[in-house]
Amino acid sequence: MNSLLKIFSFRVDLKFRKKRNYFVAKYTICDSINIGDGTKIWSFTHILKGAKIGSLCNIGENVFIENYVLIGDKVTIKNGVQIWDGIHIEDDVFIGPNVTFTNDRYPFSNNRNYKLEETLVKKGASIGANATILPGLEIGYNSLIGAGAVVTKNVPDNSVAVGNPARIIKRADFHSEIN
């Protein structure tokens, strides 16, 4: 009976997946059904059931997205990124390859007093390759985090932060400078 149920649920799953309006590459585990139209999810990526991903996103290879994650529209996540519980990424954000997000400032293997610290990446922010974002922080609107930066404090809107620890080196409205 259990094997028959597994076969039936597999067939239902196949029918459901044919009707989706987003792309999932081979060798990807996508447990979430909360994925927006036009989103592309590439190989060797694992998205857990509770994750919510907006429309027109591009999620690279070898990405892991945990349950309590919110990702807005038009977000690009490059290869090798892990996004843990409590991370909220607003619209139009770029996350470079191998960016590391953390959600527990004091991790232990058997931590019963685990405190999830939420992180917010605001609209239009860009995070360079190999940057590390410590938990409980806010990356400001249209801010830029340089490659390899270790962000230990909040980054204000329209700022450039670089280094270890990351420090603000410039403040500007980047979108108005481009136009």
Residue ranges of predicted features:
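Internal alpha/beta core interface subdomains
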Residues: Y141-L144, V150-T152
